[in-house]
Curated annotation (Swiss-Prot):
Pfam families xrefs: MscL
Organism superkingdom: Bacteria
Name the UniProt record assigns to this protein: Large-conductance mechanosensitive channel
Compartments (UniProt record): Cell inner membrane
Record GO terms (molecular function): mechanosensitive monoatomic ion channel activity
Gene that encodes the chain: mscL
Keyword Membrane: yes
A GO CC term assigned to this protein in UniProt: plasma membrane
Organism: Phocaeicola vulgatus (strain ATCC 8482 / DSM 1447 / JCM 5826 / CCUG 4940 / NBRC 14291 / NCTC 11154)
Family: Belongs to the MscL family.
Function, in words: Channel that opens in response to stretch forces in the membrane lipid bilayer. May participate in the regulation of osmotic pressure changes within the cell.
Quaternary structure, from the entry: Homopentamer.
Keyword Membrane: yes
Membrane topology: Multi-pass membrane protein
């Protein structure tokens, strides 16, 4: 097993259709996630924050230990930032719901494609058509022998 065999195997693996499709899906999914996160953070959450008393969810935190100054050096407060968790949870729910709707739409479109019947095969020739075809072929044969 030489180096070139390893590289050829890797190239064959990387160029398979499903690997490339998956890579494209991951890239598009990342971009889609950013769009949905922006919609959640910038469009959906502000009105929800207003409804619950003007709260910005990302700012919600529980202070475990206050900030303190020791020997002229300020030590930051120790906080449990559960607001970020709430924001990420809302992002996840909306992204999952969006993907669910998209997959459901694709499944519906595929079902419609399957329901469309294939065009009917042309009917078999009648006995008269078969006889006329045989007569025509015999006449062509006789004309060819002359």
């Amino acid at each position: 097993m030489g180096k070139s065999s390893f590289l050829q195997d890797f190239k064959a693996f990387a160029m398979r259709g499903n690997v490339i499709d998956m890579a494209v899906g991951v890239i598009i999914g990342g971009a889609f996630g950013k769009i949905v996160s922006s919609i959640v953070a910038d469009v959906i959450m502000p009105p929800i924050g207003l409804l619950v008393g003007g709260v910005n969810f990302t700012d919600l935190k529980l202070q475990l230990k206050p900030a303190e100054v020791v020997d002229g050096v300020e030590k930051a407060a120790v906080t449990l930032n559960y607001g970020n968790f709430l924001q990420a949870t809302f992002d996840f729910i909306i992204i999952a719901f969006s993907i669910f709707l998209f997959i459901r739409l694709l499944a519906k479109l595929n079902r419609k494609k399957e329901e469309v019947p294939a065009p009917a095969a042309p009917p078999a020739p009648s006995k008269e058509e078969v006889l006329l075809t045989e007569i025509r072929d015999l006449l062509k044969e006789q004309a060819g022998k002359k």
